[in-house]
Structures are given as structure tokens and as C-alpha cells.
Amino acid sequence: MAKHVKVAVTGAAGQIGYALLFRLASGQAFGLDTTVDLHLLEIEPALPALKGVVMELEDCAFPLLRNMVVTSDPRVAFNDVNWALLVGAAPRKAGMERKDLLEKNGSIFAGQGKAINENAASDVRIFVVGNPCNTNCLIAMNNAPDIPKDRFYAMTRLDQNRAIGQLALKAGVDVPSVKNMIIWGNHSSTQYPDFYHATIDGKPATEVIRDKNWLLNDFISVIQQRGAAVIKARGASSAASAANAALDSVWSLINTTPADDNYSVALCAQGQYGVDEGLIFSFPCRTENGVVSVIEEIEHNEFGQQKLKETLDELREERDAVEALGLI
């Protein structure tokens, strides 16, 4: 067992952090052949609660968990880490759109980007969960000029998993039957859950699910508004499902993608599909021998092109807003 990874988790005492850490320590992201150090970052008032989480982690006696660092100092948290999972963010409350969070979270992610730039290992990769995650990732990336831009990612896997779940339910099939379910653009209510390119048992989803009205209206709106629906029902935002999607994402970014599938992650655009270079945009991706690449040969009908434009326009607006605030 030669492999070892140091992982920073921000917002470690929060609900997503609590749902994430035990699975992370048990090998569910990096594999059963990789030992883990956890660097846990929290704001000062949450440190006592975080110490309780650390006690529980100790009490699990995970064979793969080597060391834990508990701190409120980003420089300590990101020191020599190979992965930074940026989970902590000001919470989204009922009735709140992600744009309202931009200013609130901007200074947090600018500071964390700088701390990662100055303290992390040379091979660090950054994965942003805290919302609005695309633009929080953009802010962190622009405040870490020494780290290659292709090491920054934001999570749209929760949307992908939600979409897979809904297609499986509607088609009456098991979840593994659904593949190539792509999320395009922003992790927000403008995202485009692209059922046109999804497959169910190897056939186009549109051939298996004949209810076009459901696909065009109910399905898309359910996925776009699922986060808000969970908040309304639960009184708090998605936590366990978000943690699960983060683990899925890290696994997919590290391991070779099966030949008949892809996964969605937001990353730094290089002009693919007409997206502005430098925007953090969700694309269909594959990993081959540790190298992540965007699948570029997908064609969109008029409906898909319009949906891509809507989410791209929103991401441009968010970028312009944080530029005006001096955050990038």
C-alpha cells in the first residue's frame, strides 16, 4: 500500500462535511489502496463541533486514515495538500438565488485561492462544492495564478445523479441502465440536463421514454429546481446527496472512465462549444490514465443550443459581477 493523499476539506463541521468525511476516510474517493490525511478547516466558532467530528472519526478506527489536522487557518489547512475540497460556503436559504451569494462567498474563495496557491503541494487539485460553485471556483482559480487552470473543478455531479435517478424512475429501470447523462453549464436553475444524449440500456433515452412533454418540461424543471425542492421539504439544503456526488466526482476525475459512459464536471473552458475561455462550465468529460478531457464531438439541436445559451449567459453575468467586485 504505497499510495498516500493529503486532503483538505473546508466547512468540515457542516452537514455536507459530516456526510463526506467518514466515507472519505473509508476509501470511497481515493480507493482502498490509498491512505489519507485529513486537513479540516472551519471558522473559529465551529471548531468545538469539528473536534466532536474528529472524535467520531477516531472512534471509527478507519485503517486508511492516518492523520488529522483541525484548524481555522487556511494556510495550515492547505499546507502540502494534494486535494482541496472546498465545501464550506455561506448557506443558501429558501427563496435565495445563487447570485445573492456571490458577494457573500466571493471574499472567502478569493482568500482560499491565495492560501492554496501559497501552501498546497505542487500537484494540488481543487474541487469546489460550496455554492454558487462555478463562480466560487472561478474566483479561487483567479486567485491562484501559480496553479494550472486545468486543476480546478466545480461540482455538477449532483445534478447528473439527480437526472439519472429521475430517468431510471420514469423508465422503470435500475440506475446502472442510464448512461451518458450530461449536465451542461452552471450548477443553478439554468443548467441544461441533456436527456437527448442520454442512453437507457444502450438506446437513446428519447426512444425508451416516449413522453416528450415530460422530458421537455417536467424532467428538466425537476432537475433544475431539485435543490430548492429539497430545501423546502427538509428545511436545509442537500447534504448527504451532495457529499455522495463529491465522492463520485473525485473518483471519476482519478479513475479511467468506462468506454460506454461519461461524467459531468465543471472546469475551465478552453473555447469548447463556444463557451468563453476561462469560464467554469460543466461539460461531459472522460478520464483516461489520469488525464481529464472534454468530449467535444457532441451536436445539439435548436432546443439544446438555446439551453446552452441560457446557462452560458448566466455564467457570463456572474463573472462580470465578481469582476466588478474586484474578486477576479
From Swiss-Prot:
Keywords: NAD, Oxidoreductase, Tricarboxylic acid cycle
Entry's Gene Ontology BP terms: malate metabolic process; NADH metabolic process; oxaloacetate metabolic process; tricarboxylic acid cycle
Binding site for substrate: 92, 98, 131, 162
Catalysed reaction equations from the record: (S)-malate + NAD(+) = oxaloacetate + NADH + H(+)
Keyword Oxidoreductase: yes
Active site: 187 (proton acceptor)
EC number per UniProt: 1.1.1.37
SUPFAM superfamilies: LDH C-terminal domain-like, NAD(P)-binding Rossmann-fold domains
InterPro entries: L-lactate/malate_DH, Lactate/malate_DH_C, Lactate/malate_DH_N, Lactate_DH/Glyco_Ohase_4_C, Malate_DH_AS, Malate_DH_type2, NAD(P)-bd_dom_sf
Source organism superkingdom: Bacteria
Pfam families, A to Z: Ldh_1_C (PF02866), Ldh_1_N (PF00056)
Class of the enzyme per the UniProt entry, highest EC level: oxidoreductase
Binding of NAD(+), residues: 11-17, 105, 112, 129-131
KW NAD (keyword) present: yes
Primary role: Catalyzes the reversible oxidation of malate to oxaloacetate.
Family according to the record: Belongs to the LDH/MDH superfamily. MDH type 2 family.
NCBIfam families linked to this entry: MalateDH-SF1, PRK05442.1
The protein, known as: Malate dehydrogenase
Organism for this UniProt entry: Coxiella burnetii (strain RSA 493 / Nine Mile phase I)
Name of the gene encoding the protein in the UniProt record: mdh
